[in-house]
Amino acid sequence: MASPAAGGVVIVGSGLIGRSWAMLFASGGFKVKLYDIEQQQITDALENIRKEMKSLEQSGSLKGSLSAERQLSLISGCGNLAEAVEGAVHIQECVPENLELKKKIFAQLDRIVDDRVILSSSSSCLLPSKLFSGLAHVKQCIVAHPVNPPYYVPLVELVPHPETAPATMDRTYALMKKIGQSPVRVLKEIDGFVLNRLQYAVISEAWRLVEEEIVSPSDLDLVMSDGLGMRYAFIGPLETMHLNAEGVISYCERYSEGMKHVLSTFGPVPEFSGATVERVSEDMCMKVPDDPEHLAARRQWRDDCLMKLSILKYQMQPK
C-alpha cells in the first residue's frame, strides 16, 4: 500500500473512465480526489464506485490487497480544482474527447500546479503536441491512454510530448505498474498511437472482406474471437511469428514472400458507408439488438468475460 508520503492522485472528470481510474488508484493504496464541475455528478460517481467495488469484492474480483471499504475510504469528491490538486503527485484528466475542452482543462491546471506533479491525459487519439504545447509545465505532461474498460484490461499507452521529460515517462510507467496496469512506452507521438493503429488495420481489412462478400459479418467476428483473438490474448503478433517457426529470422525466410503477396492485394481505406453499413448492422443486431437494454447486458457480459480472462492470464504467467 502506498504511504501518505507518496502523495495523492486527482481524477478530473467522473465519467466511466474517470471512475475506473479512481478504482485502480485506490486499489494501489493511493488517496484519490475525484473532481467534477457538477456536485451531483460527483455524488453519482461515488455511489457507482461503491456499488461496483462491493460487487467485485463479492465475486472475488476486487483488485489490490485492501478491502472494498478501505479502498472506498481512499476516494473522495471535490468540486474545487485548486483544492483538489493540492499535494497531488499525479493528475489524470478524463473529460470527453474534445481537444478544446481538454486544452482548457490543462491550461487551468498549468496555472495552479507545482513543478513536481505529473499532468496526464486519458486521450485515445489526441496528440500530445496538440494537447500540451505552450504549457509552462509541458515537461511534466504525458498521455496515459487506457483501454476500455480499464479495470479489466490493463494496457496503458504512455505517449510523450516532444518536450516531455524522461523522468515524467519513468515515473508514470512506475505508477502504472504499481497499480497493476501494463504500461507500454510509445517512443514518439503518432496518429492513433499504437493500439488504435493495430485495431483500425484489423477493422479496415475486416470491412473489405465483408464488403467484397468474402465472408459474412458474423463469421468474420468468429475468425477473431475463436481464432486470432485466442492466441493474441496471451502472445502478440511478433511472438506468434517467433513461435510459428524456429524464431523470427526463420519465419521471415519462410513466409515473407507469401505475406507480401497477400498484403499487395489489400485495397484502399474503406468508406464505412452505404450498403455494407446496413449489412453489418443487420447482422450485429440479429446477435445483439441495438437498444440500450440489450447493449448494456452484452457489455456487462463482455466485462465479465474480460474479468475472468484477466484472472486466467495472471494464473498462466510464464515461469
Swiss-Prot record:
SUPFAM superfamilies: 6-phosphogluconate dehydrogenase C-terminal domain-like, NAD(P)-binding Rossmann-fold domains
Activity control: Inhibited by malonate.
Keyword field contains DNA repair: no
A GO biological-process term: D-glucuronate catabolic process to D-xylulose 5-phosphate
Record's catalysed reaction(s): L-gulonate + NAD(+) = 3-dehydro-L-gulonate + NADH + H(+)
Keywords, ordered alphabetically: Acetylation, Cytoplasm, NAD, Oxidoreductase, Phosphoprotein
Protein name: Lambda-crystallin homolog
EC number: 1.1.1.45
Subcellular location: Cytoplasm
Molecular function via GO: L-gulonate 3-dehydrogenase activity; NAD+ binding; protein homodimerization activity
Subunit structure: Homodimer.
Modified residues (N-acetylalanine): A2
Domain of life: Eukaryota
Keyword Phosphoprotein: yes
Pfam family, one: 3HCDH
Protein function: Has high L-gulonate 3-dehydrogenase activity. It also exhibits low dehydrogenase activity toward L-3-hydroxybutyrate (HBA) and L-threonate.
Broad class of the protein's primary localization: cytoplasm
Alphabetized InterPro entries for the sequence: 3-OHacyl-CoA_DH, 3-OHacyl-CoA_DH_CS, 3-OHacyl-CoA_DH_NAD-bd, 3HC_DH_C, 6-PGluconate_DH-like_C_sf, 6PGD_dom2, NAD(P)-bd_dom_sf
Tissue: Widely expressed, with highest levels in liver. Undetectable in skeletal muscle.
Species whose genome carries this gene: Mus musculus
Phosphoserine modification, residue list: S3
Family membership: Belongs to the 3-hydroxyacyl-CoA dehydrogenase family.
GO cellular component: cytosol
